[in-house]
């Protein structure tokens, strides 16, 4: 049974802040910051936007592109690390917001930035087992960075959703490969508002080791090489890391660049690589071969081998594209950024 992507949707907030604006507020060298991360600006959710509202918007567009009725959806899984509620799932809110039946599997998944891709893999299993006809996988985050800390320059906001099924496929997911270990590169304790990163652990032992392990494992099992793929999409904590890991694996820049979005919206965590995939789907031709590798701190990666179908081109314009959302933007200054992020609040009386 062929299983894969029936439809997809995304949501990127309109509000953006230049990394230069943040650097000037803290007295940092804006050019040095830009050269370090290659992130020009990032998306910022408005006061009434959060991972739930973004997940709803992305899922609605995914259903439109899929041509699937809400009543046909048998499961909804949401991957996030920034839930608005400590105890209350996003997935159950999506059931009512999208008009799904009550008889659906629903769960919020957690593994740092790769839970959204875990949601896809779990839905694939349910479809293959004939337990459901279609499922919705969501990656959504409003990423947190402590003011004045370097993470603030790269964390962004956004969501992406994929309808997974076995009919009317825009792209078939032909193979997946996992790679995981106990690596303390990045964490946030329950009582802390902001995460902590393990400095030297964030690069070689975490991001690069796991993405390379998953990508090489997938290619070795399939007997494929970098030149067999038309596109390569990797998790994007900044714009340097995906280009560097591509070079380490042997992928040329022209196969990686189409899927990079972090330079314009920041690292959207669970939506990061999956937004990159959505952008690639907007330009890929039928028969295109795509490798996607997600990454979540702690640490683990999922590698996907995806091949597009003849139905892909007809689905692209059915909903707003990543390209359109990247262009639809309003810039804000740092004071509004702090307000929209609820870092500063008005105290009454």
Swiss-Prot record:
<feature type="binding site">
    <location>
        <position position="297"/>
    </location>
    <ligand>
        <name>(3S)-3-hydroxy-3-methylglutaryl-CoA</name>
    </ligand>
</feature>
<feature type="binding site">
    <location>
        <position position="29"/>
    </location>
    <ligand>
        <name>(3S)-3-hydroxy-3-methylglutaryl-CoA</name>
    </ligand>
</feature>
<keyword id="KW-0414">Isoprene biosynthesis</keyword>
<dbReference type="GO" id="GO:0003985">
    <property type="term" value="F:acetyl-CoA C-acetyltransferase activity"/>
</dbReference>
<feature type="binding site">
    <location>
        <position position="113"/>
    </location>
    <ligand>
        <name>(3S)-3-hydroxy-3-methylglutaryl-CoA</name>
    </ligand>
</feature>
<feature type="binding site">
    <location>
        <position position="202"/>
    </location>
    <ligand>
        <name>(3S)-3-hydroxy-3-methylglutaryl-CoA</name>
    </ligand>
</feature>
<dbReference type="InterPro" id="IPR016039">
    <property type="entry name" value="Thiolase-like"/>
</dbReference>
<dbReference type="InterPro" id="IPR004656">
    <property type="entry name" value="HMG_CoA_Synthase"/>
</dbReference>
<keyword id="KW-0808">Transferase</keyword>
<protein>
    <recommendedName>
        <fullName>Hydroxymethylglutaryl-CoA synthase</fullName>
        <ecNumber>2.3.3.10</ecNumber>
    </recommendedName>
</protein>
<feature type="binding site">
    <location>
        <position position="154"/>
    </location>
    <ligand>
        <name>(3S)-3-hydroxy-3-methylglutaryl-CoA</name>
    </ligand>
</feature>
<comment type="similarity">
    <text>Belongs to the thiolase-like superfamily. Archaeal HMG-CoA synthase family.</text>
</comment>
<feature type="binding site">
    <location>
        <position position="235"/>
    </location>
    <ligand>
        <name>(3S)-3-hydroxy-3-methylglutaryl-CoA</name>
    </ligand>
</feature>
<dbReference type="GO" id="GO:0019287">
    <property type="term" value="P:isopentenyl diphosphate biosynthetic process, mevalonate pathway"/>
</dbReference>
<feature type="binding site">
    <location>
        <position position="244"/>
    </location>
    <ligand>
        <name>(3S)-3-hydroxy-3-methylglutaryl-CoA</name>
    </ligand>
</feature>
<dbReference type="InterPro" id="IPR020616">
    <property type="entry name" value="Thiolase_N"/>
</dbReference>
<feature type="binding site">
    <location>
        <position position="240"/>
    </location>
    <ligand>
        <name>CoA</name>
    </ligand>
</feature>
<feature type="active site" description="Proton donor/acceptor">
    <location>
        <position position="235"/>
    </location>
</feature>
<dbReference type="GO" id="GO:0010142">
    <property type="term" value="P:farnesyl diphosphate biosynthetic process, mevalonate pathway"/>
</dbReference>
<feature type="binding site">
    <location>
        <position position="30"/>
    </location>
    <ligand>
        <name>(3S)-3-hydroxy-3-methylglutaryl-CoA</name>
    </ligand>
</feature>
<comment type="function">
    <text>Catalyzes the condensation of acetyl-CoA with acetoacetyl-CoA to form 3-hydroxy-3-methylglutaryl-CoA (HMG-CoA). Functions in the mevalonate (MVA) pathway leading to isopentenyl diphosphate (IPP), a key precursor for the biosynthesis of isoprenoid compounds that are building blocks of archaeal membrane lipids.</text>
</comment>
<feature type="binding site">
    <location>
        <position position="267"/>
    </location>
    <ligand>
        <name>(3S)-3-hydroxy-3-methylglutaryl-CoA</name>
    </ligand>
</feature>
<comment type="subunit">
    <text>Interacts with acetoacetyl-CoA thiolase that catalyzes the precedent step in the pathway and with a DUF35 protein. The acetoacetyl-CoA thiolase/HMG-CoA synthase complex channels the intermediate via a fused CoA-binding site, which allows for efficient coupling of the endergonic thiolase reaction with the exergonic HMGCS reaction.</text>
</comment>
<feature type="active site" description="Acyl-thioester intermediate">
    <location>
        <position position="113"/>
    </location>
</feature>
<dbReference type="GO" id="GO:0004421">
    <property type="term" value="F:hydroxymethylglutaryl-CoA synthase activity"/>
</dbReference>
<dbReference type="Pfam" id="PF08541">
    <property type="entry name" value="ACP_syn_III_C"/>
</dbReference>
<keyword id="KW-0012">Acyltransferase</keyword>
<dbReference type="Pfam" id="PF00108">
    <property type="entry name" value="Thiolase_N"/>
</dbReference>
<feature type="active site" description="Proton donor/acceptor">
    <location>
        <position position="81"/>
    </location>
</feature>
<dbReference type="InterPro" id="IPR013747">
    <property type="entry name" value="ACP_syn_III_C"/>
</dbReference>
<comment type="pathway">
    <text>Metabolic intermediate biosynthesis; (R)-mevalonate biosynthesis; (R)-mevalonate from acetyl-CoA: step 2/3.</text>
</comment>
């Amino acid at each position: 049974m062929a299983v894969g992507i029936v439809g997809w949707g995304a949501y990127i907030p309109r509000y953006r802040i230049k990394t230069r604006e943040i650097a000037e507020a803290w007295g940092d060298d804006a050019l040095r910051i830009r050269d370090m991360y290659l992130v020009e600006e990032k998306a910022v959710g408005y006061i009434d936007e959060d991972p739930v509202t973004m997940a709803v918007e992305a899922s609605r567009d995914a259903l439109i592109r899929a041509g699937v009725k809400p009543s046909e959806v048998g499961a909804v899984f949401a991957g996030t690390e920034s839930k608005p509620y400590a105890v209350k799932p996003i997935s159950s809110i999506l059931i009512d917001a999208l008009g799904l039946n009550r008889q659906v599997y629903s769960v919020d998944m957690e593994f740092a930035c790769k839970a959204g891709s875990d949601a896809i893999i779990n839905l694939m299993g349910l479809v293959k087992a004939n337990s459901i006809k279609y499922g919705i996988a969501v990656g959504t985050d409003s990423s947190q960075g402590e003011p004045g800390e370097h993470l603030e320059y790269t964390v962004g906001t956004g969501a992406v959703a994929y309808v997974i099924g076995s009919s009317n496929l825009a792209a078939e997911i032909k193979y997946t490969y996992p790679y995981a270990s106990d690596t303390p590169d990045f964490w946030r304790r329950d009582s802390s508002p902001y995460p902590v990163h393990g400095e030297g652990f964030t690069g070689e032992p975490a991001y690069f080791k796991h993405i390379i392990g998953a990508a090489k494992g997938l290619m070795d099992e399939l007997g494929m090489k970098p030149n067999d793929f038309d596109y390569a999409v990797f998790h994007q904590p900044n714009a340097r890391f995906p280009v560097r890991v591509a070079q380490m694996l042997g992928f040329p820049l022209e196969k990686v660049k189409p899927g990079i979005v972090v330079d314009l919206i920041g690292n959207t965590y669970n939506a990061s690589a999956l937004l990159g995939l959505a952008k690639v789907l907007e330009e890929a031709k039928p028969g295109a071969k795509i490798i996607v590798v997600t990454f979540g701190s702690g640490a683990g990666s999922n590698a996907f081998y995806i091949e597009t179908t003849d139905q892909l081109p007809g689905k692209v314009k059915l909903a707003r594209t990543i390209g359109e959302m990247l262009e639809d933007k309003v810039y804000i200054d740092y004071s509004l950024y702090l307000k929209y992020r609820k870092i500063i609040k008005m105290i009454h009386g």
